[in-house]
Amino acid sequence: MPMFSHLLHTAKQLLHRAQPCQLCGIVRADLHSVCLDCWQQLPLHPQTIEKQELSIHVAGHYQYPLDHLIQQFKYEQQLHWQPLLSGILQQIRLPKVQAIVPMPISSQRLAERGYNQSMILAKDLAKQLNVPIWQPVIRLHQHSHCVENQQSLLLLYQNFD
């Protein structure tokens, strides 16, 4: 049986490497579904921002192509971007955490999309960090996509009360 699992693992690796880069279409190396050239061109700039006793960990600048990929993943059910987005999150140097808390979405958005994009990414990150997912937060308000920025921040803070 171990021989078959080794053969299966080797076959999966070969098939995985033969898949094209999701950004440029050429055969890729194994970097979260993109080739090395495309990975190096992503606007990745991991940093930590300290705001009001909170540490906010940022993966990169919200500009092309990241902004486009995030919008497709979030609004257009382009779930094939999951490996790339998860890989980007894995590049952030996070302190030791006890759990991952995904941002909840409204029941209306969950019904529209059929999935919670932050939960999908949280599962990958929790697995990598070997920590549980914790969901103490419940969205009290409907979606806030069209709400002014200040109102969005207010809704965010209210969700954590």
Give residue ranges: language-model regions.
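Glycine-rich phosphate/pyrophosphate-handling loop used in enzymes and phosphotransfer proteins
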Residues: 1-161
